[in-house]
Amino acid sequence: MVRRQSAPRLEFEAAAIYEYPEHLRPFLSEAPALPGVYIFHSESDTLPLYIGKSVNIRSRVLSHLRTPDEATMLRQARRISWICTAGEMGALLLEARLIKEQQPLFNKRLRRNRQLCSLQLSEQKIEVVSARSVDFSHEPNLFGLFANRRAALQSLQNLADEQKLCYGLLGLEPVSRGRACFRFALKRCAGACCGQETPQAHFLRLQASLERLRVVCWPWKGAIALKESRPQMTQFHIINNWLWLGAVPSLDEAATLVRTPAGFDQDGYKILCKPLMSGQYEIIELHTDCRQS
């Protein structure tokens, strides 16, 4: 008896029924070829469908309209709006803020991480510390930003495996003084637990391997203004402790934004750290009254 094969299960594929979204064409003709943030709106004004950024809003929006994989989002879209910025930095910062505040349906969700942890190295030991108890903007010798304690310990374990560091000396497992750990017998530990390596040498190897993960302390006394310009537009991004407080068209208006942030902004740090430390932007330290001579 021949078993009759069942018909293959049909799966919905947005690309298979893609049609160019003609209802959005009028918005494309008005979209500027400038840097900034764009928003796809549904019939609801309270919940955006998608928020994106680009150095050329018009070009990026056009690419969305021509992408079959985004047919589901495009069918729900009713209008497109945008906010122009002075450059790429402003677009990055504004996009991150709007996504976190408005939680668009088709964006990856960005939320404040209340369990944010890091590894702190001090006095020949390493431990996991939380952003709830330590100021990550100013505390020295922090390495890595992790979603929680478990992720921090896993990263430390991976580092130990790569560098043949001792789990016992790192606090990852119990160790008996003077006795070799189990990993030493497997040649996965260099022997700091049993005198084959000095504690100082072990610590220096740990320190060197962590360096690529170092969290940079906020290097200014207070808030700064980052100047970003293009023809017809200049913005001063006001930043303090790695948190973007907003943008103003002139330094005279900086006082309306300056404040000391509560907590550490992980998204702001990831966006701002490398550009600020590279020297590619003009940085202006703000006085207490925020007026510059």
From Swiss-Prot:
Bridged cysteine pairs (disulfide): none
EC primary class: hydrolase
SMART domains for this protein: GIYc (SM00465)
One Gene Ontology term, aspect cellular component: excinuclease repair complex
Keyword Ion transport: no
EC number of this enzyme: 3.1.25.-
Classification via InterPro entries: GIY-YIG_endonuc, GIY-YIG_endonuc_sf, GIY-YIG_UvrC_Cho, UvrABC_protein_C
Molecular function via GO: nuclease activity
Tagged with keyword DNA-binding: no
Keywords for this protein: DNA damage, DNA excision, DNA repair, Excision nuclease, Hydrolase, SOS response
Residue spans crossing the bilayer: none
Protein's GO biological process: DNA damage response; nucleotide-excision repair; SOS response
Annotated ranges, domain GIY-YIG: 33-108
Functional note: Incises the DNA at the 3' side of a lesion during nucleotide excision repair. Incises the DNA farther away from the lesion than UvrC. Not able to incise the 5' site of a lesion. When a lesion remains because UvrC is not able to induce the 3' incision, Cho incises the DNA. Then UvrC makes the 5' incision. The combined action of Cho and UvrC broadens the substrate range of nucleotide excision repair.
Listed PANTHER family: EXCINUCLEASE CHO, UVRC/OXIDOREDUCTASE
NCBIfam families xref list: PRK10545.1
Protein name: Excinuclease cho
Gene (UniProt): cho
